[in-house]
Amino acid sequence: MENQWLTTEYPNIFFENNNVGQLKKEIFDAPMSEIEKILKDYDIPSPSELGKAGSYIQNTPRKHVMEERRKNDIVLVPVGCTECHGDYANSGLDTFMVTQICEALRRYTKKKGKPVSLAFTPLNYGAHPYHHCGMAGTIIMPEDVVRETMINVMLGLWNDGLRKQIWINNHGQLWVLESALQEFCKRYQLPGIYRVIDWHRAIREFFIPIKRKDSLSTDFIHADEAEASVGLLLFPDMLDMKYAVDTEGESLLPGGHFDTSVDPYRRPQQWQQGEGHSAIERAAVPEGVVGKPTRATAEKAKRPVAAILKYLTLVHDEILENYPAGKLPPVEKISLRDPKDIEPFLREPMSKGWKSVFELPYIGQINSL
């Protein structure tokens, strides 16, 4: 047990002694010069590539997409929302954070000769917790709409040969995405590798305030020091910091039960697991901010962004090393479908003998009433 954990000088920050924890510890301890080198490897910062030809499957000639898929059949799907993040920030803050992180990973893998595929976010308007209701600038989609959108995009990507899907979330709607992933698997039982990653939580240790020059000084909550810092690093022209204000939420019951956005305190409940214990956003923080964005600097976002890029690269590389393009885990181990029956569906799309998911026999329980 003594070698199970990699500790730091901060008792609340430690890492599991495995590939993931060792990677995080290395970045946590790295000098700023090494962090800068990591960011340079991924060409951070760079302008948004949403309109840049050859970045996303939607702005790349299909022939090129197919050729790249034969080398690397992993697809990244960034997920954000449209939400008030205070007068200083753009309402697409979440979307631009996550798309630029995904774009950086594509740039990096392209340099290595096997570019990961990147899909436009299907959820520019997302699901929200109840306490977001009533805020101007926040556009709330019904959870069923968000769930079905994700399920059908997963199906379409799978049908096009992108059967290893990493959905990267940048908004407070994780429970909906988790539910969609599980429903997709139950409904279709298609062999593949599917992940939803809440990227802030994936590298939560880097959002915990510590005594270091490049560290944040406050806990990550919403439209705060953490989010503004990431925005200042990745897309500073979309922010106007002279309009930033600091606020605090309002608790209506004793604290200590519900954690903040990245679960740094390991409290009994995550922030989304209740309502009524705190005032809704409209009543407590009509500014659309919970925290201190006035303290934000691009420098404070460099280590967290380096950490998520290295972690996502690890996830990507482990999948591709174990299951190269065109290969999946054994069908009989991850699906109740007969391997012989599913074989035509697993062929390269539009190749001889290939079958589309629209020819897929239905198995399993009824999925809707």
Each language-model region and where it sits:
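Extended, histidine- and acidic-residue-enriched regions that form the cofactor-binding/catalytic faces
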Residues: 1-141, 148-164, 170-369
